[in-house]
């Protein structure tokens, strides 16, 4: 069977830059699934994405499905015919479904009986006939949150569509996709190259688009070119470009023919905190800031044009004129804000609502101040500095700079606090209170910052859960999942001596009578333990390991982490599987018994050597391991408990637990309960698979 290259390109108006990659990757994944489901042999499925196009190129695509033999088993002969040998309704219905009569059916005989059988040779359908529907289905499944309709048609897509190119080798596949009749026409760059041209063969893509249309269709190639050219441009001016991955992706999605240029701004603007300048350059203008080798911001920026100009200086000057007013605004806001102390903004917090039932930002500030001080006392941080940081924590939200450049919250608080002469750990805490902002983000760097960050997040968790507005489905308007994980990460990775139980109780207490959910403390703790589950799964721990620890509901995050590591290590021991199975057996035996057990094993009642030996080892280990449990040495404890494998195996091999003698039975059940209690001091290992 011959093979050909297949090309599909959807030419559109400008696609959303932040969604471009995901649209292209989903298109490729969807179409690959369609090919595989149809049984069409194919090679690599390569995706292309530019601001005004999505495309796929499939190598070595078979021209048709392979022929195949199908078999459909019908009713058993006993049910297929009545006593007179006439076909039953079941047999006739089955035959109609196969497109035959009962007389035409074959017989299938096995050692289990005889059945009606339909066999047929099905010729594979041509690829040309299958492709249009496969493309349409793949496009319909794209992750598009908001569809657009244009013109008088009812066609919906992420952006209006102008061209559809479907080529199998050199042949156009006739189809109407998204309201457009397919052909071999491709549109080039808006201002360079040929605005429109035809492509003779799918193998010519994407090179023909580069040569004639001045469009680099390969997304990764554009991105790599921007990165390399920007690094070289920065090197020429003695600096390093801030090429964050997210901005690189966005810029690569905005241009078809990237041309990297370097511009500058007035040095006087460097007196403004670099974060505000960078926010303007990256967030508003999509420019790449440039830093000196010592980490200081240079009065330069790198940007990417979408055209090769005969006069690039004109483009550079235009961009410099655009950015100057934004930088001047930042300078003005910075100078104006510093005319008063950060603390002077406190009264204005009373005018901003945090949440209707939970009060204003000033109310939240008071709670954070108190909770940060309480946390500082628990973890050995400076209580005065923590309460001071709590008092100032939201003051920068009332400044001109943060009002205009919202992403500078926190960092501007730090700069203004330093200007006011606040303690350095207080100033740093104002910046780091929102950390970690995302998975993998840095944690607060000092104890005061940790106390403030935890206090801010716990106040939000307690308040929102306290009024019954916990996250539902994928809706999480107060970012409670991120807040919970942030608290857990800080406590675990900084090894802080905090208990979720007392921490949540204190956060709830500070709300007074504002909360309506009587179960708020348990709800918050359960929610946070649930985030532990997600976190440890991401870290590579098995689900049953997590469940074994969760079963004990440890509320000290650092303690939870120690148990997780202990159980994970325990699983590597030779005795682990046998002891997990034994614990499961013990758990089942105890669950089936409703008899009241004694507090301790009666040694005089023990009879068999195996139970005597096991009882002695349980007693010895109980006393030996008590300091281990008290110190959180769970891994060492489980290693010691692994020594019980042989006596436990011997006990179950030789000793009957549920004997008729009540005293003996209860004594053996008590011993098993004491055995299980030892393991439960760490985790419920009966849940290990």
Swiss-Prot record:
A GO term, aspect molecular function: arginine-tRNA ligase activity
Entry's family note: Belongs to the class-II aminoacyl-tRNA synthetase family.
Protein name: Glycine--tRNA ligase beta subunit
Alphabetical list of InterPro entries matching this protein: DALR_anticod-bd, Gly-tRNA-synth_bsu, Gly-tRNA-synth_heterodimer
Catalytic activity: tRNA(Gly) + glycine + ATP = glycyl-tRNA(Gly) + AMP + diphosphate
Pfam families: DALR_1 (PF05746), tRNA_synt_2f (PF02092)
EC number(s) from the headed UniProt entry: 6.1.1.14
Organism this protein belongs to: Escherichia coli O139:H28 (strain E24377A / ETEC)
One cellular component term from this protein's GO annotations in UniProt: cytosol
Single Gene Ontology BP annotation: glycyl-tRNA aminoacylation
Localisation per UniProt entry: Cytoplasm
Leading EC class: ligase
């Amino acid at each position: 069977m011959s093979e050909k290259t297949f090309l599909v390109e959807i030419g559109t108006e400008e696609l959303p830059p932040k969604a471009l990659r995901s649209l292209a990757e989903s298109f490729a994944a969807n179409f690959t699934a369609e090919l595989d489901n149809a049984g069409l042999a194919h090679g690599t499925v390569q995706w292309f994405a530019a601001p005004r196009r999505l495309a796929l190129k499939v190598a070595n695509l078979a021209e048709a499905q392979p022929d195949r033999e199908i078999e459909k088993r019908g009713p058993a002969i006993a049910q297929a015919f009545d006593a007179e040998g006439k076909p039953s309704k079941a047999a006739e219905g089955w035959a109609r479904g196969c497109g035959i009569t009962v007389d035409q059916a074959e017989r299938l005989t096995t050692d289990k009986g005889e059945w009606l059988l339909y066999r047929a040779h099905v010729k594979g359908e041509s690829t040309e006939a299958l492709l249009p529907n496969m493309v349409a289905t793949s496009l319909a499944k794209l992750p598009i949150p908001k569809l657009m309709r244009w013109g008088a048609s009812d066609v919906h897509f992420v952006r209006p569509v102008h061209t559809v190119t479907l080529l199998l080798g050199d042949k156009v596949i006739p189809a109407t996709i998204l309201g457009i009749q397919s052909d071999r026409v491709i549109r080039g760059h808006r201002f360079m190259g040929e605005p429109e041209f035809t492509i003779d063969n799918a193998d010519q893509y994407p090179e023909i688009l580069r040569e004639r249309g001045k469009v680099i269709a390969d997304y990764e190639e554009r991105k790599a070119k921007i990165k390399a050219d920007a690094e070289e441009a920065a090197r020429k001016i003695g600096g390093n470009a801030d090429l964050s991955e997210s901005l690189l992706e966005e810029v690569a999605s905005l241009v078809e023919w990237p041309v990297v240029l370097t511009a500058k701004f007035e040095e006087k603007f460097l007196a403004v905190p670099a974060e505000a300048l960078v926010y303007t350059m990256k967030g508003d203008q999509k420019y790449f800031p440039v830093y000196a080798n010592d980490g200081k911001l240079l009065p330069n920026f790198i940007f990417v044009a979408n055209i090769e100009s005969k006069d690039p200086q004109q483009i550079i000057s235009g961009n410099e004129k655009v950015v100057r007013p934004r930088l001047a605004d930042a300078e003005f806001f910075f100078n104006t804000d510093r005319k008063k102390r950060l603390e002077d903004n406190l009264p204005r917090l009373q005018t901003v609502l945090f949440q209707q039932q939970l009060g204003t930002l000033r109310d939240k500030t008071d709670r954070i101040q108190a909770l940060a001080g309480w946390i500082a006392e628990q973890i050995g941080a400076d209580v005065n500095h923590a309460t001071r940081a709590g008092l100032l924590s939201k003051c920068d939200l009332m400044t001109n700079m943060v009002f205009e450049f919202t992403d500078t919250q926190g960092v501007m608080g730090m700069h203004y606090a330093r200007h006011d002469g606040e303690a350095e750990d207080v100033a740093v805490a104002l910046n780091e209170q929102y950390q970690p902002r995302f998975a993998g983000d840095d944690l607060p760097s000092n104890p005061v910052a940790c106390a403030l960050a935890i206090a801010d997040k716990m106040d939000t968790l307690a308040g929102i859960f306290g009024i019954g507005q916990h996250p539902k489905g994928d809706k999480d308007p107060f970012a409670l999942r991120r807040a919970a994980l942030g608290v857990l990460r800080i406590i675990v990775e900084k090894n802080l001596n905090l208990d979720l139980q007392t921490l949540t109780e204190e956060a709830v207490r500070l709300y007074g009578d504002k909360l309506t959910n009587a179960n708020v403390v348990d709800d918050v703790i359960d929610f946070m333990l649930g985030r532990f589950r997600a976190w440890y799964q991401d870290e590579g721990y098995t689900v049953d390991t997590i469940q074994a620890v969760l079963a004990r509901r440890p509320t000290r995050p650092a303690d939870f982490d120690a148990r997780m590591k202990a159980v994970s290590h325990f699983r590597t021991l030779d005795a682990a599987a046998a002891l997990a199975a034994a614990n499961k057996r013990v758990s089942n035996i105890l669950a089936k018994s409703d008899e009241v057990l004694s507090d301790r094993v009666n040694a005089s009642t023990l009879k068999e050597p195996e139970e005597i030996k096991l009882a002695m080892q349980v007693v010895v280990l109980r006393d030996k391991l008590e300091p281990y449990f008290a110190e959180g040495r769970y891994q060492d404890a489980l290693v010691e408990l692994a020594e019980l494998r042989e006596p436990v195996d011997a006990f179950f091999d030789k000793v009957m637990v549920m004997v008729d003698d009540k005293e003996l039975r209860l004594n053996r059940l008590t011993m098993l309960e004491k055995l299980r209690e030892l393991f439960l001091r760490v985790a419920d290992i009966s849940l290990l698979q």
